[in-house]
Amino acid sequence: MKTITQFYRFIFLLFLCLQSKINAQNSSPELSLSPIFSNHMVFQQNNINPLWGEATPGTNIMVKATWGETSKVKTDKSGNWTVKLKTPSYGGPYSIEIKSGDNQIELDDVLIGEVWLASGQSNMEWKMNHCSGCIDNQDYEITNANFTEIRMFNVPMDLYGIKINDQNWKVANPQNVTDFSATAYFFARELHQKMDIPIGIINTSWGGTRIEAWTSPKKLNELGPTIHINHREKFLKPHDLNDPNEYSILYHRMLKPTIPFGIKGVIWYQGESNVSNYYDYSVLLDGMIRDWRSQWNVDFSFYFAQIAPYIYSKKKNSQELRDAQRKVLNITPKTGMAILLDIGDENDIHPRNKQDVGKRLALLALKRDYGFDIIDSGPLYSKHEIKNGYIEVEFDHIGSGLIARGELAGFEIAGSDGAYFPANAKIKNDKVHVHSNRVEKPKNVRYGWKNYFEATLFNLEGLPGSSFSSINP
């Protein structure tokens, strides 16, 4: 059995490698650039940025940028070439000239600023005009999207590596922004408005996809022994090359073409499709983050959106997935989580309020990457202490203080028998005191422990607290 499954995996990986080789051989360019480089693009500022392409094997390539940088290289025996361009602080527009003999390519309207990769499933893919009314204040937002220094590149949803050549960078205006990821656009807009510098977004997202599809085969194999046995066995099944949820397929087709483009960090909105295997999610997300950083060889920031409340089915426990996401903050360095416990829609897994999703992701970047003196997160469970018949809960990220919106509902406590009961909660000295007459000797506490829940705990900055269980610190 083991030999057979290893054979299937070998065939799958061989197909991907051969398909990439066939695509390269079919183009046979005298000089070409990777499609991720085009007019209107944004380079990461103050960075050494790779720029790559193909040409006749053994020929000389010269790249000259109008900000004063020049680089030369010779193509390898396969015709591949990569140069490194050092960028100054933000600015532009610039142009870049690439020459090989008599062949020449010129990139125009190139900006230098901050570049972020946006990835995930449908709530990241969700376009500004996905459907009528799909975004709060949709018509107003599209009509007023006039930001010449916000640019986006959409990696096409393509399992065969064919469509990427049809893509290019787009400037944010009412005509182009309709095809922008709403979450990523509002993230970029917040950064741009606060810093007044160019912002570039590389959007590589696909609705309904699981985290395993975005993780490399090597990393999944490394994680195999640490995750649930039923889940691990799925690694060994024959691969379906037409399924975007096939393990590692989006890593190969949607992520790898962007590596090693110079980026500042990653924003990630995914998890709804992994609710059924919530018990593995913290391991999988931690592993994927570390894997991506290894692929880029950069310890970049990684900020993710906690999935929003939604009714799901009675058999699913999305609160467990939310808590798995929260746990990643404690095990994976340079991560942050945008808490969305107040913007869920009971009947729609896709919240219309993408503005606050983008803004809360941007708060993390503004504080942690750009040094803004702001509160960047809602309250996060820190610890609890058993008092005389009640539990006192402490939180990080309380900002200017804790507040309740309406009744401070959603808290439950349990004794040593593990049976939870609704509890009364009140804020005292920026801590939450929780008690129930039905639990004489409380041991554990949890908050927002439902598929759908409307947040009641906030900090004074208006950011909601995360659901949590003290069993999973």
Regions found by a protein language model. Give the residues of each.
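Cell-envelope and extracellular/periplasmic
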Residues: Q25-P473
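Bacterial Sec-dependent N-terminal signal peptides
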Residues: M1-S28
